[in-house]
Amino acid sequence: MKLSQVPLKEIECAGPVMRASTPYILEYAEVASLAEDLFETYRSKINHAATKLGPRQRESNAESYALLGPDRELGHFHVVYDVDETRLAIELSDDEADKFYRLMRDQRIITPDLGLIRRVMSGNMAETVAAMLWQIGAIKVTLGDLRPLYKVDEGRNYSPIYIDVKGLASYPEVNDFVLSSAALLVRNLDFDVVCGIESGSIAIAAVMAQKLAKPMFYARRARRYPEASPFEGIKSHELFRKRVLLVDDTLVHGWTKTRVIREIREWGARVEACFVIFDRQQQGSTDLEQAGVKLDSLTNRDAALSPKIPREISFLTDEEYEEVVRYFADPGAWHAAHGYTFHEPSPLD
């Protein structure tokens, strides 16, 4: 059994101990192979000085393994077989326990809980939506030590944070709350038709259009052949002089959106408003403003990093929070500090 296969019901890290539990009663053979894989993960990703896994020590309904170095014990892996779950604990140094926590937190069983969010925080709508995105794992963070940094700006630059809301539909309660809130936000805008962008925002645009009782079409990312229409779901004469609300999942620089805006206008329609679920606040709104389009967003990076969102919702560590803040404050300096060349974002590069 691989460590990455274990679904976790709970996970926490306090000092030198990372604790987790799975709702499954693991078999002895599964735990034995799990311990082997845990040790290999520890040696390859966290402490190259580790030499071997100690023998299993069993007592009553628990067992443990020592993680051994050349001349001493480096830590321990404990397993407790409970009535309806298997509890796991890893004892290491504070720093190493934190790394194991960051490795394993994405394996938690995601159970969206809007009630919990409302109980533990008192934020505005943007902060509440951001908390829900954290809760379902739509916002991801890496320091680059255990998992690679994310590539952005068409693969030319790096980022410690990635926002992916394409999985909203996997969580119906969250999806309904977020898109109902989105429809409420744009209901007073003047538009006749909703336009999504292939492929990330097609589902978002379709649900919003349904809630707003408006027709919907979508723009292609690229034409498959020169004569192909840039749009699907609408004909040229149907778009003539229509007011279009452009909808997308996230906004970084706005290059794709300004291209779509230009193509819509070439078909004789008007575009004066754009809506996104998440705005990374990296000058994308300025790009849209220069194109004569006003941006509305449901949430953004400021809301996602709000101190009102507790760590039991975001699962973010202090080190990760500080890393993301440094990145957004000055991406160029952040790249230099990590030994990377920063390429000034430009759609013409």
Can you describe what each PLM-predicted range is?
Residues M1-V247, L251-D349:
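PRPP-associated nucleotide enzymes
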